[in-house]
Design a protein with these regions (language model features):
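Catalytic cores of enzyme domains
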Residues: 1-158
Length: 159
């Protein structure tokens, strides 16, 4: 049974957050595979937000376009690329994956001074550089062309 969000729903001051990984739900639902930075690479790329709907409605499972949880990541699947490693300002991404604690320290501790600047809204600043100017930014990257192919039209290969 599908229930709609009530008209009188009040969003708490601290926002809404799920107690599960939206990226993992999207992966299990067949929407993409994981990258070296732990982001989900979909047909529209890695630079996105995920959300899910909890329901008891019956759906027919869709076929998966991939067989490995890291198939769309050029570094994990063929040892090429690694652009997200280069893009990370705090060294939280390396050949072995994403150091979530190092990333968290950068986002929530090192950047706290940014929140005091005029016009800043919120209590922390996200980073997301590992999801921009990379071959998987806006699509599933083409194999064997990780460095030669810019992530977005108009960017140089090593921007």
């Amino acid at each position: 049974k599908i229930q709609f969000i009530p008209k009188g729903l009040v969003v708490p001051k601290e926002g809404l957050a799920s107690t599960w990984s939206e990226r993992h739900v999207a992966h299990v639902a067949g929407h993409g595979t994981f990258g070296l930075s732990d982001g989900l690479i979909t047909s529209k790329g890695i630079a996105h937000r995920c959300g899910s709907v909890v329901t008891d409605a019956a759906f027919k499972p869709s076929a998966r376009a991939y067989s490995s949880p890291f198939e769309y990541c050029l570094f994990k699947s063929e040892g090429s690329c690694g652009r997200c490693i280069e893009r990370c300002p705090c060294g939280a991404i390396g050949p072995d994956g994403h150091d979530k604690e190092k990333c968290r320290q950068y986002m929530f501790v090192a950047q706290l001074d940014w929140t005091k600047k005029p016009g800043y809204i919120g209590n922390y600043s996200g980073c997301g550089l590992c999801q921009t100017k990379v071959p998987c930014e806006a699509r599933i990257p083409r194999r064997g062309r990780a460095i030669a192919e810019p992530a977005v039209v108009g960017l140089k290969a090593r921007d």
